[in-house]
Amino acid sequence: NPNALRGYSALVPTLSAGLPLTLLGQDTTSITDIQLENSKNVVGGMVSGARQAHEAGLMIGVGTDTGMTFVPQYATWRELELLVASAGFGPAEALRAVTAVNASILGVDAETGSLEVGKSADLLVLNANPLDDLRALEHPALVIAAGHPVWRPAPKRFADIDALLDEAYA
């Protein structure tokens, strides 16, 4: 797309949607040999494309396809880690992608995506610095959405899936 570098296009690589199929054993994923090879080809292209887009300066946002077996709805932080590990992002770039860039892609950056006077009061309060370890995002102390606080949010977690992903991404 010749307009991509001019701000008309954005990429949301969604690496967490495919990577588990290539990293977890077939005894866990229950995919066939053909599906595994196809997954490796697709995921290789996803990772390569994300890295190339990042190097070219394209607008890159963050998404997860959270309805998939190995993509829990509470684990967006893993997608940020994958962007850092696989696509050449720094932690600050990954955090900007999931906040300001996502808001810009969706056309709501005048209302949210950064902390500014007049914008919606949307923020996380964490117990550690995510620039040191993105996993600090896993257990926020406080979520404020449109000015409404939620202390120590506790989504239902899937310990078995979390353990598999911890091992796969180690």
Enumerate the predicted regions with their spans.
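Extracytoplasmic/secreted cell-surface and envelope-processing proteins
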Residues: 1, 21, 70-73, 135
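Short amphipathic alpha-helical segments and helix-helix/interface helices
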Residues: 1-3, 50
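Active-site gating loops and adjacent loop-to-helix segments of metal-dependent hydrolytic enzymes
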Residues: 3-41
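Active-site/binding-pocket entry motifs
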Residues: 17-21, 59, 130, 149-150
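His/Asp/Glu-enriched, well-ordered alpha-helical/loop segment
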Residues: 31-37, 42-129
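C-terminal cap of metal-dependent C-N hydrolases
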Residues: 98-100, 120-162
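Long, low-complexity intrinsically disordered regions
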Residues: 169-170
